[in-house]
Swiss-Prot record:
The keyword RNA-binding applies. The lineage of its organism: Bacteria, Pseudomonadati, Pseudomonadota, Alphaproteobacteria, Rickettsiales. The N-terminal domain interacts with the head of the 30S subunit; the C-terminal domain interacts with the body and contacts protein S4. The interaction surface between S4 and S5 is involved in control of translational fidelity. This is Small ribosomal subunit protein uS5. SUPFAM superfamilies: dsRNA-binding domain-like, Ribosomal protein S5 domain 2-like. It comes from Rickettsia bellii (strain RML369-C). HAMAP family: Ribosomal_uS5_B.
Amino acid sequence: MSKVRKNEEALSEVLVDVNRVTKVVKGGRRFAFSAYVVVGDKAGRVGAGHGKAKEVNEAREKAKQAAKKKMMKVSLYQNRTIHHDVIGRSGAAKVVLRRAKAGTGVIAGGSMRAIFDSLGVHDIVAKSIGSTNVYTMIAATFDALKKLSSPKSIAARRDKKMNEIFIKSSDIQVNE
């Protein structure tokens, strides 16, 4: 039984990195290309993939297929930002993602911006700390996105209702 994905043509594709790689053999050097692609539907689904081939277009296509296989769903707050602040790590890379007010825009550098644009995030503040290698930054960003949870999923995990999760300001007691 094969999986058929709807809206496959509606996916946005961003080529994040292209690199020429070399294999040294007895007769000389063999050149190939490596590509890293981020795909998303701009509605909460995003994936990243890596591909290698003799030609750039073939490498890009392989990377796109790999990214489609690795797509994940991310719950967004009001379809514009994340639910809470989160930190992601991968190797020497560390990223801090913070939710932002409406109208803030995407404040993120490099490959993180490609992920947020493909994801459909309109307001977010992201900071990269440590390594700025494309591969590790994307892996750290995906690590952070995996750590996100919506209030609905938290309520389900705790066997509580949604209104029990949120604290009312009138219920907070201040000790003087």
